[in-house]
């Protein structure tokens, strides 16, 4: 969970859970610390969800128990995941569906959404513009030039935003410290077929 503040308003990007390590028996999930925003929930203009993995959406039900009408902004698939999760908690969310290329203004935050490829479809990065500058938050992403859904990370949009001037770049990519390249998902199909044939 990342909280941005501008002129007294708060924008949250992602609100996920951590999973316990083996030395934490009996712990199911670890929630983010809501103490910074708990007394300022009325200042939260939205929660932007970059994709539907639990470490990015898993704590949303607990946040909405604090204030149920916070708008959730995300792609169609991401919102479908969170709506199903919230149904289990008997919460009906206020949602704003976006796609790559869309722009929305929430409070004093001008949001632009950019396609990124990840191990879950319909993932988005978000450029956040205010009078103070621009933040580019990638969410999780990978560089797969041949994804099964044919939706690649939009490097052209990143270049355009970079030329405009990014003041803060926040990026998150699993195994970014591992040398080499990620195998394309299309290259995994033959291996999966072989397993099922044996």
Question: Which residue stretches match the model-derived regions?
Answer:
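His/Asp/Glu-rich metal-coordinating catalytic cores
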Residues: 1-48, 53-198
């Amino acid at each position: 969970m990342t909280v941005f503040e501008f002129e007294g308003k708060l924008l949250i990007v992602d609100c996920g859970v951590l999973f316990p390590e083996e030395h934490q028996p009996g712990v199911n999930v670890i929630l983010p610390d809501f103490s910074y925003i708990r007394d300022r929930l009325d200042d939260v203009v939205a929660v932007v969800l970059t994709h539907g993995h639990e470490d990015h959406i898993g704590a949303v039900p607990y946040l909405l128990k604090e204030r149920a009408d916070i708008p959730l902004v995300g792609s169609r698939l991401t919102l479908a995941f969170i709506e199903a999760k919230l149904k289990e908690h008997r919460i009906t969310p206020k949602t704003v569906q976006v796609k790559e290329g869309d722009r929305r203004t929430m409070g004093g935050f001008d949001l632009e959404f950019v396609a990124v490829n990840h191990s879950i479809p319909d993932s988005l990065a978000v450029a956040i513009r205010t009078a103070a500058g621009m933040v580019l938050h990638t969410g999780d992403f990978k560089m797969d030039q041949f994804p099964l859904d044919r939706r690649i990370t939009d490097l052209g949009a990143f270049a355009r935003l970079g030329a405009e001037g990014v003041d803060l770049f926040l990026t998150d990519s699993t195994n970014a410290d591992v040398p080499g390249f990620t195998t394309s998902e299309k290259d995994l199909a033959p291996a999966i077929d072989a397993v099922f044939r044996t």
